[in-house]
Every structure is written in C-alpha cells, then in structure tokens.
Amino acid sequence: MDVFGVHHDLIAEYEAFTSSLVAVRDPDIESHLAGERERKTRWPDPKLALNPTFRSGGTVASLCDDGLLHPMCREYFRHKKHLNDPGSRTLSLHQHQREAIAVADRGDSYVLSTGTGSGKSLTYIVPIVDKVLRHPNPDGISAIVVYPMNALANSQLHELEKYLTWGVPEGHRKVTFARYTGQENSEQKLQVLKSKPDILLTNYVMLEYLLTRPDERRELIGAARGLRFLALDELHTYRGRQGADVALLVRRLRDACEAPGLQCIGTSATMATGVTFAEARKEIAKVATRLFGTKIEPKRVIGETLERSTDPGPDAVPGVHPANPLPTPSAAPPQRLMSFRPSTRP
C-alpha cells in the first residue's frame, strides 16, 4: 500500500470537493485562498514518526539463570495467547527494564522515565513478583500499586491475569493479586478483604479510604504491615495540590504499615525536559524525593537506551552527526526519502 499516494489522492479529492461548492469571483478572496493552499493551512503535510529501537537487556530466563530473578519467573513471564497457554517463549527485556530489575534487587527506590510503549509496568511488576516468591509477606500484602485512573488499573489487571494465571503449572506457589477501586461491588470488596492478595492495585482516592475507613484499615492496611513496595504509575500526573495530597498520603501509608524501609517506584513517560539527560535526571530525582519522602539519587532515574536502526554513515541524513543524534532544524530530508514509494506487492 502506497500511504503517501493515498494521502495525496485523499487531499486532492477533498480540495476538489470544497472548491466546487462556491465559485469565487472576487480576486482578493481568490488570492487569499490561493495563499492558503500554497501554505497548506487546511491540509498540512503528514507527520512521520519512527518507532524507537530499545537496546536489548536479555531475557527473563537469562536473568533467572544469573540468579537475579526467582526461577519461577521463567514460567510466569512468557508470551501467552490464551488461558491454557503456558507460553511459547520467555519474555525479552529492554536494557532499561534490566537496569530497573537490578536496582530493585539492591533494595533501592527508583524512577523509570521512558517513552510510551517501552514496557514500564514490567519494571515494577517483575521485581515485585520476584520478591513475593523469595520472601512473601506473612501478613499478606507485599506491594501496593497506585494508578491515577481506573482504566490503567484495569489494563494492568489483565496483564497480571495473563502472566500469573494463564498456563501456570500446578503445584507452584501462586502470586495473588486483586484490584480494589470504586468499580468493585460490596461482595467483591469483601472477597479482597478476606483474601489479602500479595499485590493490590488501586488508585490514590481509594488508598485514602483504606487509611480512614475502620474495616478496610484493619483488614488491608493491617495485612500490609511491613509493606515492601509502593509503585506510583504515571508519576507526572501528581503535581500541584494533588501532588501535595499524594505526597502526604505516601507518608501516612508508610507510617500506618510500619514500613520505614518501603521501596518506592515511580514510572512516567514525560517528567522533565532538560537540555541533557543528566539535568533531567536531577530534576526528576528531586521531584520524586519530595513525593515519596525518601531519597532517590539521580543515578536511580532510569532512562531508555536506544539503538540506531539506520545507516550511521556521515552521508545517511544531512545534518546528523555522531555527536548530535538529532537533525538540525534547517536540514532538509534527502531527495531519495521524498521520492520514496513503498511497494504495493503483498
């Protein structure tokens, strides 16, 4: 399919349609409309975006072989398609995911700041599952994951179902999980209160209720005594007054759970726009330290590591140099790119 040709034909048809509606006789108006067409005000050129190639960080199986992960993680984190599918192969990890797992193994708090689609959730789910398998909380809850929206919690619930229940061999220690938000009815909430899962998914509003409602505080917060992990997804959403509320909530949770060594994890696609990544890391670490109430070093802010997928030669793209990975604003695309037409063969 020639996407550029489709775009050109579509614009041409719409332009012919709109211009046929009214016959413009005034020369000034016609001149203005011609200028609008020349500047492509109504139909600008299409934007092209390239999917980044993240550097490989090995596989879950290799991390199990190295002793960085519990052997059972090899069975959990696999590519699965249906309920009874044990998975055809183990998950492959990106470099930033491996770095996060290594930092978590040392017991440090950290923040992951990488792009959309980079697998940020695995950077806390894998370490949490590993810790539950190695050192389960005898009181029940080992980790609380907080989302700013229920839609994100729902998506993560499905991922946990896929990894932790689909095709898992019988006889192995099960890692339990549950969602506790305003979506659950009374019966479902009662079941969570009784089961006390290893991993609890919630939002910051419901977490406030867990700390203030007597029954929920007694059952769930009591079961989270000595809490190991607190993960805040989409960290950049907690700003201003809401950020202050969540910061106080984190401190109250730490005290209520009697967890002075609580390991805090934050994930975000966008948090700082420094000139360099080193400057961005400092700013992100400062914000995360304020939010979590625990020291997060700039070196514990993990970013993505990309690999070049194009010809690195000096003439590959004008304006791109090894020391400057981004094209200069004045650099025009090469002519061979502008004249490129994908093959229409299947």
Predicted segments, located by residue:
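Helicase-associated low-complexity/disordered flanking segments
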Residues: M1-E99, V175
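Conserved interdomain linker/interface between the two RecA-like ATPase lobes of SF2 helicase motors
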Residues: I265, A269-P346
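SF2 helicase catalytic motif II
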Residues: L200, Y204-Y209, D215-P260
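Conserved motor-coupling elements within RecA-like helicase/translocase cores
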Residues: Q183-L200, L291, P325
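Conserved helix-turn-beta segment of the N-terminal RecA-like "Helicase ATP-binding" lobe
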Residues: L152-T181, R281-I296
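Conserved SF1/SF2 helicase motif Ia
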Residues: D130-Q156, P169-R173, E258-P260
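Walker A/P-loop NTP-binding motif
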Residues: A102-Y110, L122-P138, R251-R252
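Conserved Walker A/P-loop ATP-binding site and its immediately adjacent core
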Residues: G140-L164, V205-Y209, Q242, A269-V275
